Amino acid sequence: MTKVLIAGFAGAMGQQAVTLVKSLPGFELSAVVGHHLTDLDPTSYGLENSTTVYADREQVETGAADIWLDFTVPAAVFENVSYALRHGMAPVVGTTGLSDEQVEELQQLAKQNGLGGLIAPNFGMSAVLLMKFAKEAAAYFPEVEIIEMHHEDKKDAPSGTALATAKLISENRPAHETAPDSTESLPGARGGDYQGIKLHAVRLPGYVAHEQVLFGGSGEALTIRQDSFDRSSFMSGVKVGLEKVGTLTELVVGLENVL
């Protein structure tokens, strides 16, 4: 049995992940981590007695799990993944907010410890396809902006998916800035900027996770959109990550790179 630890198990994504892991043949939910919990009885959370509950990552010992599945918060994810790698656990990371420099540092740490892992800005298949299609379209439509819409509790902006989309687009189009002479009567009105690609973040109740990539050309426009209406939509990608991570020899970024 492959032992899985879920960090951030009490959150919305964490709860979906708990249900998934418990249903997967060949996988065991060996441990969970919830920040500053006072009740460490697994049955209080609907878990088996065999599942260890930790209130802090520093309490997790080597051998507690084979896989560290992270659905925590941007402020904690770097230290969480570092801890997992130093203690022999292959990370599968759904938490966003890691900088490029932090990802590179984690990749080096994974190499030093002989572990593979997966960092996925989005586990939804529709989002993965959106990124793929947007990259292809950028070769023909260099004028592009991105709008991402999420629930009001999402901490980081822009979303990891929107930023990953911008990075992929920038790989497949010449250096370009849309409307460079535009001015803002309200600071921030034109959104954030990644290599000339404007990114706009919406945070509102009623939304889960949504993204639009808008391309403009002479006399025409192209919009690529994906919508995640329920967090269960991400679990097919999490399942792939859990099943594939044991075959990886490096820390991979992007679910599309293990499909």
UniProtKB/Swiss-Prot annotation:
NAD(+) binds at G8, F9, A10, G11, A12, M13, G94, T95, T96, A120, P121, N122, F123. Pathway: Amino-acid biosynthesis; L-lysine biosynthesis via DAP pathway; (S)-tetrahydrodipicolinate from L-aspartate: step 4/4. It is an enzyme of class 1 (oxidoreductase). The keyword Methyltransferase does not apply. It is found in: Cytoplasm. Its EC number is 1.17.1.8. One of its GO terms (cellular component) is cytosol. The active site is at H150 (proton donor/acceptor), K154 (proton donor). GO terms for biological process: diaminopimelate biosynthetic process; lysine biosynthetic process via diaminopimelate. It catalyses: (S)-2,3,4,5-tetrahydrodipicolinate + NAD(+) + H2O = (2S,4S)-4-hydroxy-2,3,4,5-tetrahydrodipicolinate + NADH + H(+); (S)-2,3,4,5-tetrahydrodipicolinate + NADP(+) + H2O = (2S,4S)-4-hydroxy-2,3,4,5-tetrahydrodipicolinate + NADPH + H(+). This is 4-hydroxy-tetrahydrodipicolinate reductase. It comes from Limosilactobacillus fermentum (strain NBRC 3956 / LMG 18251) (Lactobacillus fermentum).
